[in-house]
Amino acid sequence: MATGYSTGVSPFDLDENNHNDSIHHRHQNHHSQSHDSSGERDDTEIEDIIQKTSKLNINTSTSTKIKNFFFQSSNRHDSSNSPPLREVFIKTINPLILTAISSFVRLYRIDVANSVVWDEAHFGKFGSQYLKRQFYFDVHPPLGKLLIGLSGYLADYDGNFDFESSNVYPDNVNYVFMRIFNCFFGILVTPLAYKTAVILGYNQFTCWLIAFMVIFEQLSLTLSKFILLDSMLLFFTVLTMYCLVKVHTLAIARVGSNSKTPLTKLEIKWYILTGISIGCVCSVKWVGLFVTALVGFYTIVDLWIKFYQTFAIDKKSPKKMSVVNYLIHWVVRIFTLIIIPMTIYVATFKVHFMVLNHTGPDDGTLSTLLQGSLIGNDLQSGPRSVAFGSLVTIRSQGLSPNLIHSHPHNYPQGSQEQQVTTYGFKDDNNEFLFEFGVDAGLRNQHATLENENSTRNGGNDDDYYHVIIHDGDTVRINHKNTGSYLRANAVGAPITSSSYEVSCFGDVESNDWADEWVIEIQSQDQSPDPMFQDEDPSEIHSVSTSFRLKHKQLGCYLATTGKSYPAWGYQQGEVVCKYSVFSRDKNTWWNIEKHVNNKLPLPATEYVPPKPKFWKEFILLNYAMMASNNALIPDPDRFDKLSSEWWEWPILNTGLRMNSWGDADIKYFLLGNPLITWISTIALIVCPLYLLVVGIKYQRQWILLSATDTSNANPANSQSLSLLAARALLPLAGWVLHYVPFILMGRVKYLHHYVPALYFAIFVAGFIVDAILNLDFSYHNNKFQYIFKVVIYSTLYLVICISFWYFKDLSFGMEGSSVDYRHLRLLGSWMI
């Protein structure tokens, strides 16, 4: 085995000189033995043969021309010798034909279901929010939903349809245009798949096979007919793969030309396009991080090989790259593959915040300052200074910025006292009262509210206090609805056992030292209105003051963890009391949001809240998205007909009913094309075995495994390692990266999560078919091999089309009784 690396710039560009020389040496020995045994030919006889053959007029047969047209590798022909028509077909005509077929099967009957289908109820509603400019919260990044909003805008939709599941679209909602807009992304996947196969150097029959499998793959086909994110996600995933393959092949071409420049302008262009595509795919769904990981792993291997070439770790290998050129490779990749994608991702959130500038249904999940910046917000900031007796809601400033909440349900373990949680919706169980410390309680002094919100009865005027709360004051926090006090207990919290449990306990007459908290002011945000810029910094002010609550007995701080309670806690956020060394720990920071106190004067003019900081809101929103994603766990006590498990997807053990199943409904059943899915699954099993065989043959010096193009070598004993990496390893790694994470995830899973992985599986299938049909059958002549290949490819095209035609109604919509379609139920688990 060789130990050095060649000048190749892409992964797996190994220096195989020693290995290949060994093979050539064996071939030469065999040749010399044959030559010695055969004897010398007569010179005059040789001259006679040369003269005769020179007079021959050799014409290429029609079958040979057809063979070269279809089976010549798509990226290896010399345009000066190739027929111009072939160039036109590969670059223009073939992609147009495939795009036309893809358009027909995806647009056909796209309008037939005139009601809200499946997740159109979610994403159509989010598009409406953009048109109404009302803030909302969702677990996915904004780009895909912004595009849905754009489709509604272009369709003259006003955003006032509710998109309730199964509701019929009114006449003023041009749902057909919005579906076509979404379908456009699904259509473009086909020409991208074809062009990717062309760049990989496949012959035209293999390119068409891959394109046909993509066209008639019914998971993505069905999803592309509706207002969903899946087509956009798949398109940008495919585009990223296309750009990566382009970068790979350009790098190989540069090395083959012995260029001295570290990167050509064309390579830099495609690196930039790769970065743009990564930014877009991650801005549609976080599943885009999986194809980003594929690019990342490729880049790591690439840079490691260049490091080896630059610093010549193996002393036997010469230094093949300067340090400056190596650093240039780093700079280009950091800028194009990290900075550009991150800029696009952040920019989509910037647009998201700019468009959604009105209050909406999900304000309860937002920070107080972000709510205050929304037009029409319902913040009741009340008097500027908070006093004992004030009724308040208290919001966390941690990564899960919800309101502190309690309800009359107890912990099943620990103290078994009343639960304390954080809650993302505005509710009267979020309301608390600031009460004096225990010393005042022992003197029977209680701060109360003398208004409709008060829960106290009677009393003299002397019993009412409106003393302003200052930094360092001791307070008790009383839950308004249950009358119990917020406290910390010296037992482990239910989820985060390293911190103390927080509960509510007792009543207004209780005087327990465990109920006392100390106010520690951390910061005062300044209003842009000069009238509110001279407020006392030692006082607690609603909205603008950030403070911590330190438990007086235990010395720990009231905090959120970002974790959620299980079903007994209604999946609400965990609240704990923890020791915090750093005062800047935002999980221990709180602010007053709602403030009611009729004893105190209101400001002369309406309070203008401080402006929210974009980066803070960006981080908070992304963490909230992550927390909500993690909270989407299956309920073990509930049977979910729509969800499925990861092991069911490659074998199509289950499908998914996308809408109502009545006889009067147009019914859609989400299911992959069985033939295509099963072929791709078999290929996923065969591919590692094939690569293992290639590795064994290489190790035993039975084949050449060159880093360079071997198009002119005998395919029986030579292969291009770079092409092998691009054709087999990249798609196989893409499938693994898009599939294995769902095995590890605890969240609820659905069949459509397999769509990106299936795309990579199709390319693995194309590789295996191409590899098998290009084996060197030396005992047959070339004409037989050509006919054999044509028959096999034609058969594959035919059975793919027949399979699609047989199951077409699952994607085009089933009318009438579902009984009429029971013949499509090949497996008993398919609920057709």
UniProtKB/Swiss-Prot annotation:
Record's note on what induces expression: Expression is repressed by HAP4 and BCR1.
EC number: 2.4.1.109
Sample GO molecular function, one term: dolichyl-phosphate-mannose-protein mannosyltransferase activity
Residue ranges that the Swiss-Prot or TrEMBL entry lists as coiled coil: none
Gene Ontology biological process: cellular response to neutral pH; cellular response to starvation; filamentous growth; filamentous growth of a population of unicellular organisms; filamentous growth of a population of unicellular organisms in response to neutral pH; filamentous growth of a population of unicellular organisms in response to starvation; protein O-linked mannosylation; single-species biofilm formation on inanimate substrate
Enzyme class: transferase
Pfam families, alphabetized: MIR (PF02815), PMT (PF02366), PMT_4TMC (PF16192)
Membrane topology (UniProt): Multi-pass membrane protein
Keyword check for Endoplasmic reticulum: yes
Location of this chain's protein in the cell: Endoplasmic reticulum membrane
Database matches in InterPro entries: GlyclTrfase_39-like, Glyco_trans_39/83, MIR_dom_sf, MIR_motif, PMT_4TMC
Pathway stated in the Swiss-Prot or TrEMBL entry: Protein modification; protein glycosylation
Glycosylation sites: N20, N59, N357, N453
Start and end residues of each MIR domain: 383-437, 466-522, 537-595
Biological role: Protein mannosyltransferase (PMT) involved in hyphal morphogenesis and drug sensitivity. Transfers mannose from Dol-P-mannose to Ser or Thr residues on proteins. PMT1, PMT2 and PMT4 account for most of the protein-O-glycosylation activity, while PMT5 and PMT6 may specifically modulate a much narrower spectrum of target proteins. Required for biofilm formation and virulence.
Name the UniProt record assigns to this protein: Dolichyl-phosphate-mannose--protein mannosyltransferase 6
